[in-house]
């Protein structure tokens, strides 16, 4: 492991706040800044974790020369625009899933990474879960034999889970099933096909504005 130190800023402090102790525990990371639109909520989190630099304006954060990389955990529609802004401002990017909501945004992000030479990570968390790592270890040791067929599903409607997912369309969570399948075999997708699987419940459709189970 390199001894190089990186100054990190976390953008979005809902789900994003869960990553603060992880960054603070990493020997190569200095978590020096946080960013959230709601100043009172931002200050509460920053006080809890003793973080000095605080921004309510993302553009102002990107002007900070001390920040090497941003970890984006903002609402999904902001992911691609904020990632592009960060890359063009000279910052490495770690962004929670999904990386974008259109193919065009994905292509633009790939182009920006090529042009800047900076690092971009779509931070899919499932491939770091203990369950996935356990199965991956079994597969790599040959204990699962040769894979003939692999399928995955990602349930959300479970007792005890937060209800934020009800406002999201299912496709926004596709990475949670695609990434572990690809990660298991260290592979890349060769082609993509899609079919619908009916409709979602009426109460969920009203919240998300989407009646389709895709």
What do these predicted ranges mean?
Residues 33, 53, 68-69, 149:
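Short, Asp-centered acidic motifs that coordinate Mg2+ and/or phosphate
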Residues 130-158, 164:
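Rossmann-like NAD(P)H-binding beta-loop-alpha module
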Residues 1-49:
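N-terminal Rossmann-like dinucleotide-binding module
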Residues 4-6, 118, 148:
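Nucleotide donor/acceptor-binding cores
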Residues 159-214:
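Rossmann-like dinucleotide-binding domain that binds NAD(P)(H)
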Residues 51-58:
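Conserved SAM-binding strand-loop segment of SAM-dependent methyltransferases
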Residues 69-76, 80-127, 142:
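Beta-strand-loop-alpha-helix segment that lines the small-molecule cofactor/substrate pocket
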């Amino acid at each position: 492991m390199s001894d190089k130190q990186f100054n990190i800023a976390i953008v979005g402090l809902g789900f994003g706040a869960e990553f603060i102790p992880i960054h603070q525990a990493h020997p190569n990371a200095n978590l020096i800044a946080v960013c959230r639109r709601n100043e009172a909520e931002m200050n509460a989190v920053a006080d809890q974790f003793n973080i000095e630099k605080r921004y309510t304006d993302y553009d102002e954060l990107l002007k900070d020369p001390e920040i090497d990389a941003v970890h984006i955990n903002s609402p999904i529609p902001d992911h691609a625009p904020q990632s592009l802004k960060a890359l063009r401002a000279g910052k490495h990017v770690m962004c929670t899933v999904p990386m974008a909501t259109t193919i065009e945004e994905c292509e633009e992000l790939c182009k920006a990474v090529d042009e800047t030479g900076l690092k971009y990570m779509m931070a899919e968390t499932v491939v770091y879960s203990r369950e996935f790592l356990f199965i991956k270890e079994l597969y790599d040791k040959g204990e699962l034999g040769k894979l003939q067929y692999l399928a995955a599903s990602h349930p959300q409607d479970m007792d005890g889970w937060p209800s934020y997912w009800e406002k999201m369309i299912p496709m926004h969570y596709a990475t949670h099933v695609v990434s572990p399948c690809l990660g298991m075999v260290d592979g890349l997708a060769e082609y993509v096909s899609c079919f619908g699987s009916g409709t979602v419940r009426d109460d969920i459709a009203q919240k998300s504005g989407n009646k389709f189970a895709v």
